[in-house]
């Protein structure tokens, strides 16, 4: 059983995966709030409470964090609470198997790397990955499995909350599809701007990528896959996305763990 931990700016996804390679599947998943000042002990108590008896069946752990302070605590937690379980943290120097053809590879978020790795592993062709999180990341993978870069925009919830926070006449609203793109009240107007506006943003970015990037035109076979917590809200309004994979990031973490498994085994033998 593999424990996968995906720490983002606002929420953390904890998953358990059974099996390896093409037989691997997510059997449990939880979503909890990310606390930037959380300690290793607090993390361990939370995760151990979630996974229960499966804690004794762990064969490995893979984790990423877009919050550096939390990544540090995750490392301490794994060393202290599961010292005999091999683990991989996605950070510079870890083998991912995906070339990063960008100006500064160290700047690329671990979440973007594992998403693209998982998309290429699943479809085995050029891909555009759209991750709907606190930011919307639209990333590009070549037909050779190379990370070519991408675009980052503010997330749907973040943008809606910012509009409410900076305007005396607006308030925070539930993210839901309104009756029409033409809202009849303030809540519906904000929902229309969030849902239809960001669907148009994503379709526009994907369309520009297909126009501007060699090998991604409409004449080429390109997988366009969405993931992320708010993706289901926008999927019905998107015209460019072909696939939705709720577990894309967790599967990407598994792939990185498997690619580093031999290295981990070597470290364990040395430790003995």
Swiss-Prot record:
GO biological process: coenzyme A biosynthetic process
Principal location listed in the UniProt entry: cytoplasm
Any GO molecular function: ATP binding
Record-linked NCBIfam families: baf, PRK13318.1-3
Matching HAMAP family: Pantothen_kinase_3
Residues given in the record as ATP binding sites: 6-13, 134
Sorted UniProt keywords: ATP-binding, Coenzyme A biosynthesis, Cytoplasm, Kinase, Metal-binding, Nucleotide-binding, Potassium, Transferase
Residues the record lists as binding substrate: 109-112, 186
Amino-acid positions noted as binding K(+) in the UniProt annotation, renumbered to this chain: 131
Pathway as given in its UniProt record: Cofactor biosynthesis; coenzyme A biosynthesis; CoA from (R)-pantothenate: step 1/5
Cofactor: NH4(+); K(+)
Subunit structure: Homodimer.
Purpose of the protein: Catalyzes the phosphorylation of pantothenate (Pan), the first step in CoA biosynthesis.
InterPro entries: ATPase_NBD, Type_III_PanK
Annotated disulfide bonds: none
PANTHER family: TYPE III PANTOTHENATE KINASE (PTHR34265:SF1)
The organism's place on the tree of life at top rank: Bacteria
Active site per UniProt: 111 (proton acceptor)
The protein's name in its UniProt record: Type III pantothenate kinase
Family: Belongs to the type III pantothenate kinase family.
Organism whose genome encodes this protein: Mycobacterium tuberculosis (strain ATCC 25618 / H37Rv)
Location within or outside the cell: Cytoplasm
Cellular component, GO, one term: cytoplasm
Binding note for cofactor: A monovalent cation. Ammonium or potassium.
Top class in the EC scheme: transferase
Assigned EC number: 2.7.1.33
